[in-house]
């Protein structure tokens, strides 16, 4: 959505056809029962391991976590100790102030200095084994857990409990509500933001797909990759070319060394924008000042694993009763039907008899309390290492076991029903956002990403890392700034 976008980002969206009219069309083309796009009225559930198969609740789990209608009955049905159920009912009901006894300033300090999970254990009284149930939504939206975020950060990021903090919580609830409102405005192409990248490329190099009529048929359009790097193009895009060195020479031009098909090559340009992972830039451009290199190296991207599982039909998933399940105790914490969006020339499956794709998300961040000596950045590095060390066979086994336990009770047989699995390891995912438990509050202009993105002669820095915001519009804003720097 363009809501909240800068003028530059909004103009870019309009230039590639993603204006308000088309976004409204996307709304009408998205299935109303698709919870993945933030439709909190759609059936969404929770899956908890049981003695045999998973316990599956399908209704409105998100509403339950915020004290929605019937939340007490839902909690009573969960396979949890009776004492834990009572605590969840009290916490989600919003009828009690769990920071009672603290002054307003003490509450504010608590919200900004104690982790969400520690709050759940110390103040709400939950057992550590129950805490993951309240973490699944945080993991999906931030890639971190309630051990990494303060109470305030977690609540403003969509976690439950904001109405259980007395007057301060109710005053803060409007900010949390604004966050949920933004969730409700999510628009999604069937291939995610890949369609946006394809629209940008086609706008710059029309011959790559002359038949494209903007976003209306971008998903199904075939691209001619041979047209990307033609000398006659105003814009050239060179694939399979890994940059290994960038420097401004004594002639006032920029030399970019790269490797293409094991062959070292060099291109010379008047200007260069490094729109890549910030952590790589000190290695690409070692001539930069040490403080700038330190700023670039500070952030650690949040790792994820996304899996898509093609199954023979959607009968078992349909019988489960929801389009999305939170799975707090499983390797893949979110399991959903893939985006059922009829847009861009793509026609999704619509009936249970049709083949379907199940989308699964795994965060490797520890759900149990981490070593207090490890900062969030340390934990992100360890999580990244876990992804690198895992084999496809490891993920395949996890996927098969989890889906069988969840859907077997509805007739699913993983041996015959799964037709294909793709696993997308994303060791360098979301831009690092800073967390209050670990990072100081820097003065304006002195945060590591701000120092790191300083113009370095004819070289400028872009990408969402340079904004410390893991959103597409942040990358647009960074690109605009970098181009403005080099054309001023």
Residue ranges and their predicted role:
Residues 1-109:
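N-terminal glycine-rich phosphate/pyrophosphate-binding loop and immediately adjacent elements
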Residues 36-54, 224-233, 239-247, 255-257, ...:
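Charged, often glycine-rich, active-site loop that binds/positions anionic groups
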Residues 133, 148-153, 167-170, 283-287, ...:
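Short, solvent-exposed loop/turn and secondary-structure capping segments
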Residues 231, 235, 239-369:
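Mid-domain catalytic core of redox enzymes
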């Amino acid at each position: 959505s363009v809501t909240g976008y800068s003028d530059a980002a909004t103009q870019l969206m309009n230039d590639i056809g993603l204006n308000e009219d088309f976004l409204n069309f996307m709304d009408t083309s998205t299935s109303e029962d698709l919870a993945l796009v933030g439709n909190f009225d759609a059936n969404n559930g929770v899956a908890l391991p049981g003695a045999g198969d998973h316990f599956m609740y399908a209704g409105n789990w998100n509403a339950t976590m915020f004290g929605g209608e019937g939340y007490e009955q839902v909690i009573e049905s969960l396979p949890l100790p009776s004492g834990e159920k009572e605590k969840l009912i009290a916490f989600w009901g919003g009828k009690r102030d769990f920071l009672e006894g603290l002054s307003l300033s003490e509450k504010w300090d608590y919200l900004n200095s104690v982790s969400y999970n520690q709050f759940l254990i110390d103040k709400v009284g939950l057992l550590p084994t129950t805490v993951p149930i309240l973490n699944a939504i945080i993991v999906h939206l931030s890639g971190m857990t309630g051990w990494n975020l303060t109470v305030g950060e977690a609540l403003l990021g969509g976690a439950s409990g904001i109405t259980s903090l007395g007057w301060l919580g109710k005053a803060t609830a409007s900010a949390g509500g604004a966050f949920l409102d933004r969730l409700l405005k999510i628009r999604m192409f069937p291939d995610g933001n890949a369609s946006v990248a394809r629209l940008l490329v086609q706008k710059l190099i029309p011959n790559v797909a002359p038949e494209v009529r903007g976003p209306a048929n971008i998903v199904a359009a075939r691209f001619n990759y041979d047209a990307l790097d033609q000398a006659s193009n105003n814009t050239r895009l060179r694939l399979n070319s890994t940059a290994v060195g960038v420097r401004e020479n004594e002639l006032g031009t920029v030399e970019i060394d790269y490797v293409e098909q094991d062959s070292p090559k060099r291109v010379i340009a008047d200007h260069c924008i490094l729109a890549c992972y910030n952590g790589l830039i000190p290695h690409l451009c070692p001539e930069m000042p040490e403080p700038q290199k330190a700023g670039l190296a500070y952030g650690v991207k949040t790792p994820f694993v996304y899996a898509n599982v093609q199954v023979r039909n959607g009968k078992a998933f349909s019988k489960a009763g929801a389009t999305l399940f939170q799975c707090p105790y499983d390797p893949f914490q979110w399991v959903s039907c893939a985006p059922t969006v009829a847009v861009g020339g793509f026609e999704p499956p619509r009936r249970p008899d049709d083949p379907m794709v199940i989308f699964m998300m795994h965060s490797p961040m520890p759900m149990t309390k981490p070593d207090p000596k490890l900062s969030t950045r340390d934990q992100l590095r360890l999580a990244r290492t876990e992804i690198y060390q895992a084999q496809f066979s490891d993920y395949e086994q996890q996927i098969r076991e989890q889906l069988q336990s969840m859907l077997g009770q509805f007739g699913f047989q993983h041996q015959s029903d799964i037709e294909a699995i793709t696993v997308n390891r994303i060791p360098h995912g979301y831009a690092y956002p800073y967390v209050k438990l670990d990072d100081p509050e820097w003065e304006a202009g002195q945060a590591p990403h701000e120092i790191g993105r300083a113009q370095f002669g004819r070289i400028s820095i872009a990408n969402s890392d340079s904004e410390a915001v893991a959103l597409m519009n942040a990358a647009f804003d960074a690109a605009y700034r970098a181009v403005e720097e080099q054309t001023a």
